[in-house]
Swiss-Prot record:
The keyword Flavoprotein does not apply. Belongs to the NifH/BchL/ChlL family. GO terms for molecular function: 4 iron, 4 sulfur cluster binding; ATP binding; metal ion binding; oxidoreductase activity, acting on the CH-CH group of donors, NAD or NADP as acceptor. Mg(2+) binds at residue 49. GO terms for biological process: bacteriochlorophyll biosynthetic process; photosynthesis. The gene is bchX. It comes from Cereibacter sphaeroides (strain ATCC 17023 / DSM 158 / JCM 6121 / CCUG 31486 / LMG 2827 / NBRC 12203 / NCIMB 8253 / ATH 2.4.1.) (Rhodobacter sphaeroides). Gene3D superfamilies: P-loop containing nucleotide triphosphate hydrolases. This is Chlorophyllide reductase 35.5 kDa chain.
Length: 333
């Protein structure tokens, strides 16, 4: 069975659009209200979605208007907020509506729970497009929906921090956010990502940008102290420390919100909500690779390992026969 001709034409149009340079512009006019747009970065699996779902819920409970936007192609930012139910993404909905000749409406892509508004930008299927370009396209669609006229106290953007693609760095590169929040833990890989984001912030500050780092949320804290040492070395504040606790792990796995006033974990997330709102954007001091490694004990990172250079013979293996020389050797006269 072959695709209908109109589907092939539609597929080609999408490919043509993906090949175009992004045209998203940062608005120059004065906003109607001072909304804090905050981008959250961290290593995949470090707990950004858990942190953001509970943070946004607590913000709403203390009277703030909050919009949570998932900017990760996995589209799992809002799952915890909505009890494990997946939202239709903006990218997916836009493609479907466009094929049907319809316009995307707010109710197609934005959903709410107890005062929190949330949506997912989404991204291409695996192997079928650029995730960063999908983020850019998603923000262009948000502008068409009236993003800059919306009335919120906070807009929280959940970004993947493991990649260096410009699309995922959009809030930093184009001053779309006022500040960045980092989520990390006491392990080298998560701090490597947070340090990379600090480097990106500092790079664009040197180019005249205004985005700064508000601070670090230490998640799954086991008390070993590496994340705290990183924050001190990078000169950024710690906004909250979330312990490695079995109750938190179990409730997160069951899609339960814990950032509720009057509960065991309520004070933790209420404190985080206030800290996020009040923390100023500052210029971080990114660490060098050696500086980052120095935060850990030699045993933890294999610092006593020595690099052994490979040789041409190593690479050739069984084919490492002696090369015939074309050099002409003359007998002694």
């Amino acid at each position: 069975m072959t695709d209908a001709p109109e589907l092939k034409a539609f597929d080609q149009r999408l490919r043509d659009e993906a090949a175009e340079e992004p045209t998203l512009e940062v608005p120059q006019g004065e906003p109607k209200k001072k909304t804090q747009v905050i981008a959250i970065y961290g290593k995949g699996g470090i707990g950004k979605s858990f942190t953001l779902a509970n943070l946004s819920y607590m913000m709403a409970q203390i009277g703030k208007r909050v919009l949570l936007i998932g900017c990760d192609p996995k589209s799992d930012t809002t799952s915890l907020l909505f009890g494990g139910k997946a939202c239709p993404t903006i990218i997916e909905t836009s493609a479907r509506k466009k094929l049907a000749g319809e316009e995307v409406q707010i109710g197609d892509v934005c959903f709410k729970r107890d005062g929190v508004f949330a949506m997912e930008l989404g991204g291409p299927e695996v192997g079928r497009g650029c995730g960063g370009r999908g983020i850019i396209h998603g923000f262009e669609l948000l502008e068409k929906l009236g993003f800059h006229d919306w009335d919120f106290d906070y807009v929280l953007l959940d970004f993947l921090g493991d990649v260096v693609c410009g699309g995922f760095g959009l809030p930093i590169a184009r001053d779309m956010a006022q500040k960045v929040i980092l989520v990390g833990s006491n392990d080298l890989q998560s701090l490597y990502v947070t340090n990379n984001v600090c480097s990106a912030v500092e790079y664009f500050r040197k180019l005249g940008g205004n985005v700064g780092v508000a601070g670090l949320v230490i998640n799954k804290d086991d008390g070993t102290g590496e994340a705290k040492a990183f924050a001190e070395a990078a000169d950024i504040p710690i906004l909250a420390t979330i312990p490695a606790d079995e109750d938190l792990r179990r409730k997160s796995a069951n899609y339960q919100i814990v950032g509720i006033p009057g509960t065991q974990w309520g004070p933790l997330f209420e404190g985080l909500a206030h800290a996020v709102g009040e923390a100023p954007p500052i210029r971080p001091k990114p660490l060098s690779q050696d500086g980052l490694l120095d935060l850990f004990t030699p045993e933890a990172i294999g610092a006593d390992f020595k690099l052994e250079p490979a040789t041409d013979a190593d690479m050739r293996g069984k084919n490492a026969a002696a090369k015939k020389s074309l050099e002409v050797i003359y007998d002694d006269a």
